[in-house]
């Protein structure tokens, strides 16, 4: 089994959902983001999502857009992100890593080369925010050959017929975008999630991770119980950004994010 399958199977036996924190690679710099990445599993991360900085992150709100710009300013490239994953794998070979980004950098890198290099670095899955199912052929064969999961995104506005189409070739887990709009804005109610999840369960047996609009421990607990995982992104980035001075990391940066992550993990595991 893949690391993603192994982790979700283990959590199912434990009777709880997963916590998936997000960090933007090289935000505010390579060393700080790597330090944070390495510390996240001990703070309660079950899987980790790494954002690949991009100059036009259309699905992201101002918080993650600002993080992407800081990452780019610090020299982030797709190759640099893979270097970070390789460094992480020197000390952790169990925690699943998922890259989240946009199609343009992958296309520029070369889809086949990217999938091979990502797998060699220790990446387990990829989420390509702006890649519709109709264009998935660009990556599908290369990803399968490299044993990489392509994580599919579905939303409240996804029709039933579209849902089955999108999830037909899905692997790893399903990322449910629980709100319409950009990241870090609104949040879905428990009632909304309870209404949405059965429809997704009918279309796939894969675990369902709920993201967009999950920011508090209570929301993370609810999402991880109704679904199979809660993804927390903007809330962690906001905390990190609040510790920066002139865009640079301070001694408060990593501890502040880890403290918040520990609180989220405690709620998910309660």
Swiss-Prot record:
GO terms for molecular function: tryptophan synthase activity. The active site is at residues 49, 60. InterPro entries: Aldolase_TIM, RibuloseP-bd_barrel, Trp_synthase_suA. Keywords: Amino-acid biosynthesis, Aromatic amino acid biosynthesis, Lyase, Tryptophan biosynthesis. CDD domains: Tryptophan_synthase_alpha. It comes from the Bacteria. It catalyses: (1S,2R)-1-C-(indol-3-yl)glycerol 3-phosphate + L-serine = D-glyceraldehyde 3-phosphate + L-tryptophan + H2O. SUPFAM superfamilies: Ribulose-phoshate binding barrel (SSF51366). Pathway: Amino-acid biosynthesis; L-tryptophan biosynthesis; L-tryptophan from chorismate: step 5/5. Pfam families: Trp_syntA (PF00290). The keyword ATP-binding does not apply. The keyword Amino-acid biosynthesis applies. Its EC number is 4.2.1.20. The alpha subunit is responsible for the aldol cleavage of indoleglycerol phosphate to indole and glyceraldehyde 3-phosphate. Belongs to the TrpA family. NCBIfam families: trpA. PANTHER family: TRYPTOPHAN SYNTHASE ALPHA CHAIN, CHLOROPLASTIC (PTHR43406:SF1), TRYPTOPHAN SYNTHASE, ALPHA CHAIN (PTHR43406). Tetramer of two alpha and two beta chains. This is Tryptophan synthase alpha chain. It comes from Gluconobacter oxydans (strain 621H) (Gluconobacter suboxydans).
